[in-house]
Amino acid sequence: TRGRERSRDPYSIQKEARNLYNNGYKEITLLGQNVDSYKWSKEANNKKKLEKSNDIKDIISFSDLLEMIAKINPDLRVRFSTSHPKDITNDVLMVIKKYENVCNYIHLPAQSGNSRILKKMNRTYDRDWYLNKIHDIKKIVGKDCGISSDFITGFCSETEDEHKDTLSLMDNVIYDYSYMYYYSERPGTLAQRKYNDDVTLETKKRRLSEIIKKQNKHSLSKNKLTVDNTYKVLVEGVSKKSNNFLKGKTSENKLIVFPQKKALIGTYVDVKVKECNSATLFGEIC
């Protein structure tokens, strides 16, 4: 379902980002199927060749690209997605730590908390590897770094104990939020060709309900930690529920809603969190 990985010329990305900033944009997202596998050189645009060759010099990695964009202007917020647990490097984490305008947030899909299921999914890492990456994030970037994930429950042959491994992984990490689904066959995929979709729909739905319930609990507990704290927020627009309120996001990618008070869309404001639910922070401009 995917072609060979290609990395776009970093200088063209830098130029585009600078032009966007000069035209009034305050936030950009570096987007890729797996941004951490980014590797580019004038001599070759082939990740495998660049990784194997000792002769090719001046290779630009994703951490290099991220820093190039961060340096354009401190008022330009930079996000990126999606990271792969096997490829994200400490160099990337160091760039996040170094530059305030690189958002304090990482989407790191786990998919499952069980190593056997991860192997069947062809994820190329196991549970311990993933947890070590989470440890690196919290150690280098900080414990306040926003972390989200993806989970697929009811994958082929997943047992009840293996499902519980996913629940225990969630308890270990405590994600800010997650995207959660139950497994359904996609024609032409490796899983569809190799494995029987043998977990009943009833079981899939029940397991999905369990991980959603746990994530909602974790999201609320993480959001409660923000109450009485003040965050720099980029005003993104008017709240869907009231024209008297604006909405924006913190560096940690948390949605926050607050009264207008003459704040302009596209500007930064300091907002103090007053209350929250599992999905949204509610605050006031300082």
Give residue spans per PLM region:
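Conserved, mostly hydrophobic/aromatic
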Residues: I13, L30, F80, L108, ...
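Active-site proximal loops enriched in glycine and acidic residues that flank catalytic Cys/His/Asp
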Residues: G32, T82-H84, A110-S112, S149-T153, ...
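Canonical Radical SAM [4Fe-4S] cluster-binding loop centered on the CxxxCxxC motif
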Residues: T1-Y11
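C-terminal, non-catalytic macromolecule-binding modules
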Residues: D165-I211
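Conserved SAM/AdoMet-binding glycine-rich loop
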Residues: N22-D161, D171
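Terminal RNA-binding accessory module
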Residues: A191-C286
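Small-residue (G/A/S/T)-rich helix-start motifs and N-terminal tracts that mark the onset
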Residues: D9-E27
